[in-house]
Amino acid sequence: MKKVCFSFVIMVIALIAAGCGAEDTGTSEDGEGLKIVTSFSILGDVLENIAGERSSVTYIVPIGEEPHEYEPVPSDFQAVSDADVFYVNGLGLEEWLQRLVENTSDVDVVEVSPTIDALPLEESDGLDPHAWLDVKNVMKYVEVIRDDLVERDPDGAEIYVANAEAYLQDLQELEEWIHDQVTTIPEEQRTIVISENAYRYFGEAYGFDTVGIWELNSHEEGTPGQISRVVDIVKELDLPAVFVETTVNKSFMTTVSNDSGVDIAGEVYTDAVGLEGSGAETYIDMMKHNVDTFVSGLSQ
């Protein structure tokens, strides 16, 4: 689908960029701060905590969709072209979107992950992009974003630095809370089984093994052989629970649950925060929800 529509989108976006590329967007609509656009909701929340009321923040990928599968529409590129800066996770998450923006707009594209010790994919070339599932990595994101915002908008430096300091403290408290919570799970039951093996950063940070039906961005997802392998692992480890993601088709993990006789303990958030009313509307609340779900399911 991406290959089919690529040329068409390029032509549309080129027209959009030509219409607005000569105009310097400068600051946000109120004459202060910056117009900030980012790729997905988790980064949007992080940026809002740092930018505060000084700058406006919007994100492209709707909640509930996966950033690496999202098909941008022309209005998305219009928003990016009108922005002062476009922040992306990097590590291959938004690679093709990033290339399109760089080829059709003068807006600066900034990766927030250059200081991350990235994990390589296990079954293919490339890097695992889900670094935000380790809170310490998000703290590194905050430092990169803070420094970049201060450089772009020196008049707002005091606001950005103060907001980042407060948010870093909140993240440190979250990090300590997670470590406290996972100690309640018996060590032999600290294995997270999920559809897409996206929790490797979380596992390395907090002492879990992780198992996915498929690896990230796999062209073969949910094959009988993949499902059978995971069912065997669940039975062999005598795990009390498996889990599903909010942005992934649940039918595959339902099959694993049925074939292994092990219940699905709940949904976790991987590539997006929760919708309003979910209790997981922010990155911090999302992580707390995930940890509570893992602890409840694996402590049985």
Swiss-Prot record:
Keywords tagged on the record: Cell membrane, Lipoprotein, Manganese, Membrane, Metal-binding, Palmitate, Signal, Transport
Primary localization: membrane
Gene Ontology CC entries for this record: plasma membrane
Domain of life: Bacteria
Xref: PROSITE patterns: PROKAR_LIPOPROTEIN
Keyword GTP-binding: no
Subcellular location: Cell membrane
SUPFAM superfamilies recorded: Helical backbone' metal receptor
Chain residues that bind Mn(2+): H68, H130, E196, D271
Stated role: Probably part of ATP-binding cassette (ABC) transport system MntABCD involved in manganese import. Binds manganese and delivers it to the membrane permease for translocation into the cytoplasm.
Similarity section: Belongs to the bacterial solute-binding protein 9 family.
Name assigned to this protein: Manganese-binding lipoprotein MntA
Lineage: Bacteria, Bacillati, Bacillota, Bacilli, Bacillales
Gene: mntA
